[in-house]
Curated annotation (Swiss-Prot):
Protein name: Probable nicotinate-nucleotide adenylyltransferase
Naturally occurring in which organism (per UniProt): Klebsiella pneumoniae (strain 342)
Pathway: Cofactor biosynthesis; NAD(+) biosynthesis; deamido-NAD(+) from nicotinate D-ribonucleotide: step 1/1
Matching SUPFAM superfamilies: Nucleotidylyl transferase
Keywords recorded for this protein, A-Z: ATP-binding, NAD, Nucleotide-binding, Nucleotidyltransferase, Pyridine nucleotide biosynthesis, Transferase
PANTHER family for the chain: NICOTINATE-NUCLEOTIDE ADENYLYLTRANSFERASE-RELATED, PHOSPHOPANTETHEINE ADENYLYLTRANSFERASE
EC number of this enzyme: 2.7.7.18
Record-linked Gene3D superfamilies: HUPs (3.40.50.620)
UniProt GO MF annotations: ATP binding; nicotinate-nucleotide adenylyltransferase activity
Family: Belongs to the NadD family.
Amino acid sequence: MVDMTQLQAIYGGTFDPVHYGHLKPVEILANQIGLSKVIIMPNNVPPHRPQPEATSAQRVHMLKLAIADKPLFTLDERELQRDTPSWTADTLQAWRQEQGAEKPLAFIIGQDSLLTFPTWHRYETILDNVHLIVCRRPGYPLTMAHDADQQWLDRHLTHDVERLHNRPAGAIYLAETPWFDISATIIRQRLERGESCAEMLPATVLDYIREQGLYC
């Protein structure tokens, strides 16, 4: 029998600020595939993105507020302690070493990230350490740009949830998660214009943003 209580996943991002578009799809995903824990890991120096507007301490505080009543989530601040870029491959390799060789582990990404995955630093080592769980994004294709990358995807693709639980790593699973049309960019723009975004993020986070004078 497959133990459906062990599978854990890391969910990385800038979270500038954290919002329902981050949290709700992952909560639904956890119910769909039996995730026991989702570890939110904010990036320090995103290699491929602009620097966050909020400080690391402010982003951590917003995350703590957002997940305070959500036992599914825990927070890991290790990447914020680095002064170098947050390379996913290095983080996941360290996590695997901590958890041991047999525990099933996963990394959650969006479909947009899957399409650029072969450009990531040491991407070929990532599936040695974790499964990839891909949340669908509207408007993005399900095929890779290059034949070799498509062959790589086809080799690892699975539709079997149990495979995520009974093997420690190596599979790519396309999840049927809903899309929430919310982004941190939209929230920052609306706050700068003095517009409401109360439906986009937890009230505690919005109150903190106002207290700190962020994004205005």
